[in-house]
């Protein structure tokens, strides 16, 4: 069995590992995903991840692809909390953990009001408070210490009203592990701190090494609030990292620009686009505003074209291989513990060489 691909960095005595991310589907299943995940497992990648938004779900492909693996951890990045009740998510997590032999990671996220209210038909009030309550119920169900009775601001178990016949229940299956790792997708400062307080890992979507100190402070706030000694040493941070090698830096950046335009400009309404706010904190608010204006006006290609190279290079690795290696070394010194990469199976060993040295 191959050893886990890691790079040890001394500041927090953690390892930087590689994971594979398949993301959510476009019009259909991504070509070559099964082969890539099998190759990642063979190469010693730490984890493989799926996602969902308002198309493919995260759990079904993860179970299918994961059934062809032996050791790689299997995670969701992310499951939409509004898509399932806490009980349904806990059931899925326990089932996946049994089927994988204790390799499952439950990655959750609140998403945004456009998706939650538009697709899942639920209100989007107080996402932080709802997340805290949601995670707490899941942990209680998985521990299986007794029948679950919870009456909170967002969830009633048993439900009060209706036929008035509900009763506290305990899961019929016993957990493979009483503590399944829970990661939280988060971008805002309070949500990042919440991840550090109540979860076992954080799943940012965009990250820049120049923002590392700011994020570390948010994480420290959460660690302190958790009251758990040594949590910082156990906590994981897994980031999807786009890597585009090539001699022409601008052409490599052109591969990344449409994705940045989509998220900064179109993935959320004005005033409620959390990805936009990430780039604004990085110092690109003026650019992001122009991108948003163009994208929402239907000028997607033009929105992508105005994204400067420095904005791409802040969140992705593009250009000649030596340049990528040098910049990856800076990324390894941040709070990130896992680089999540995508792409075809033959590229994975090259990613390992470029990113881990």
Segments from the language model and where they lie:
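Hydrophobic faces of well-ordered beta-strands that scaffold small-molecule active sites
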Residues: 16-22, 48-50, 74-77, 104-108, ...
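Active-site mouth loops of central-metabolism enzymes
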Residues: 17-31, 79-86, 177-187, 243-244, ...
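Active-site-adjacent beta->alpha loops and helix N-cap segments on the catalytic face
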Residues: 56-62, 208-223, 349
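Conserved, mostly hydrophobic/aromatic
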Residues: 44, 65, 96, 138, ...
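N-terminal beta1-alpha1-beta2 module of alpha/beta enzyme domains
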Residues: 7-76, 180
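Alpha-helix-loop-beta-strand connector modules within alpha/beta enzyme cores
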Residues: 59-79, 83, 130, 134, ...
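An alpha-helical appendage that flanks or caps ligand/catalytic pockets
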Residues: 12, 125-173, 212-330
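Short, acidic/polar
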Residues: 28-39, 92, 186-197, 256, ...
